[in-house]
Amino acid sequence: MSNIVVSNETKSQSVRTTKDGRQIRYNLQVIQQPERARACGSGAKSSADRRPVDPPPIVELRVFENDQEITFAYNANFFLHASLENARTIAPGRAPSTAGPSFPVLTGTPVAGMAYLDRPTPAGYFIFPDLSVRHEGKYRLSFALFENLAEVKDLDPEDPDVIYDGNHFVTHRCEVKSAPFTVFSAKKFPGLSESTALSRMVAEQGCRVRIRRDVRMRRRENKSSKEWDEYDEEGGGYDRARGTATPDNYGQAPNAPLGDRPRSLSSASNPALAPPRRPSIEEMGHGYSASNGYQQQMPPPQTPAYAQMPSYGSNQPQYSQQYQTPQPAPMMQPPQPPQHSTPYSQHSQHSSYSSQHQAQPPVPMNQQYGYSNYQQQPQQPQSQSQPQYDHAAPPRQEQMSSDYAHPSDYRRSSITQSPAQQYTASSHPVQPYHPMDQYGRSQQMSQPLHSSPQSYASSAPSHQSLPSLRPIVADKLEPVSPSYQSPPTSMSAAISVNSDGSNQHYALPKFNPQTQGLPPMSATSNKRSFSSTFDSRHLNERMVAGSRPQPSGAGYSYDPGSPDMEEPMDRAAMSYRRADGTQRQRHVPEVGS
């Protein structure tokens, strides 16, 4: 949109004839144009945070009589009034104008008197150091010259030949307009530049002009660090993104789509700006089960004990493929073995899965491998639920694998063999709760349980790769010592499981502090009372007749009633008082001179 062209921009002149026939010419010129301003608004704080137009406009006046300059000799008073005009055409209003309170757009001091200065050239100057604009836009200033005559000969021909006392009237003589300047909003305001040489020159001659000796411009170009103020101008698009449609779109149809609708600034529409979500328990469980499935796909080590069982190695990858798919609860669903597999191979798959579950380190956030196994598998014996400790799990695994190994295989030394027999015998009367356990129990009825050390060897890397987590104190149970020497049929009474699976009763040994080598703890606290160490008579007894606490009891080193001259100290004995109130004496050894 182009600016409105005016004829009297920057320069203007007017000529008039006096009563005696002389021609007076007035030449007005804007020698310092306004360039920028910051909109101060019309709120309550507009007057407090108001920025003047920069640089301050300066208008020069010269008065001529018949081509002879008489600026300093002309006897008259001049003042210049500034008004604000739009530099561009204003579109007609879209809404009917309401008669409401309207504030003047131009604020400050719009009137300036003439100052006779010698520099830059001898002339009269009008300076406007305090002009502000309320609203942003493109404006220009219009300066109107008014004259107050002091002599009758300078009056106009139609004026009466009288000069009123007190100068009651002025006459409009000339008008000049400034160049268009821009009023910015507070966020887009580029700042103030250093005061011009003309402003300094005027200020040196006594005029009140604000002088800035440093540049207060916002460095928006060639600046590496993008701050919030420059983010809008340097292509960051913060204001551009959250800005709504411009007023030009108000005239469109209600249902017409906006072509350049700004994108929402919400972090939900941009995944990169959204805060990261913490992984849930199920997601961590899937990743943990997938890593274990990868460990099971490794070929088992070649040991001479299981060299005669090729069916175990052939069914192991098949079992891993069944459990690699992510499921919410892999422990709750039994594997679906093929119908052509032998019972021994099916049982070996289940035993390897259960033995690997024993060797895995506890992960509290995982529901399959954490401490919640007591609710998920209430029918398992304590030896399977106990490997919640980092270093106690391998001996348990070795014991279980050695106790249930085939008699013809090589077996490692174990603590006792009775728990294995009791477990086998007591596994029949226990009622299963899970399909997984029911599947395992049906296999145990037909054949004895065979646990292979290969499953422990394959799960050992996962036990070392994952860091052990600190066990929860509330769910921590003491390891059960293998003291089950009762007949095989009494195992079901020692380890009882409720029908609802909510409460479990384990035969745990009672904690004895004497066997652990811990010092006995008394029921009461060992903290000494105040009166056993310090004199508390002044606290418990009455203080009458100006009495004060007397620290002259036994054990105190100072006695106010004793004479100033004390007895010589016995160097053979050293007496002191302990914190518990007891008096102690120690022999001081003689040091040879």
Swiss-Prot record:
One of its GO terms (cellular component) is nucleus. One of its GO terms (biological process) is sporulation resulting in formation of a cellular spore. Residues 21-212 form the Velvet domain. It is found in: Nucleus; Cytoplasm. The keyword Nucleus applies. Keywords: Cytoplasm, Nucleus, Sporulation, Transcription, Transcription regulation. Disruption phenotype: Leads to hypersensitivity to oxidative stress, compromised reproductive development, repression of asexual sporulation, and reduction of virulence during maize infection. Residues 443-487 are annotated as: PEST. Gene3D superfamilies: Velvet domain. Residues 1-16, 413-429, 440-449, 482-505, 512-534 have a biased composition (Polar residues). InterPro entries: Velvet, Velvet_dom, Velvet_dom_sf. Its main location: nucleus. Residues 327-340 have a biased composition (Pro residues). A motif (Nuclear localization signal) lies at residues 35-40. Residues 310-326, 341-360, 367-389, 450-465 have a biased composition (Low complexity). Residues 1-21, 218-569 are annotated as: Disordered. The keyword Transcription applies. It comes from the Eukaryota. Component of the heterotrimeric velvet complex composed of LAE1, VEL1 and VEL2; VEL1 acting as a bridging protein between LAE1 and VEL2. Component of the velvet transcription factor complex that controls sexual/asexual developmental ratio in response to light, promoting sexual development in the darkness while stimulating asexual sporulation under illumination. The velvet complex acts as a global regulator for secondary metabolite gene expression. Controls the expression of the T-toxin gene cluster. Promotes oxidative stress tolerance and acts as a virulence factors during infection. Negatively regulate mycelial pigmentation and controls sexual development, as well as asexual development during vegetative growth. The C-terminal PEST domain is a region rich in proline, glutamic acid, serine and threonine residues that is required for the light-dependent regulation of development and secondary metabolism. Belongs to the velvet family. VeA subfamily. This is Developmental and secondary metabolism regulator VEL1. It comes from Cochliobolus heterostrophus (strain C5 / ATCC 48332 / race O) (Southern corn leaf blight fungus). The lineage of its organism: Eukaryota, Fungi, Dikarya, Ascomycota, Pezizomycotina. The gene is VEL1.
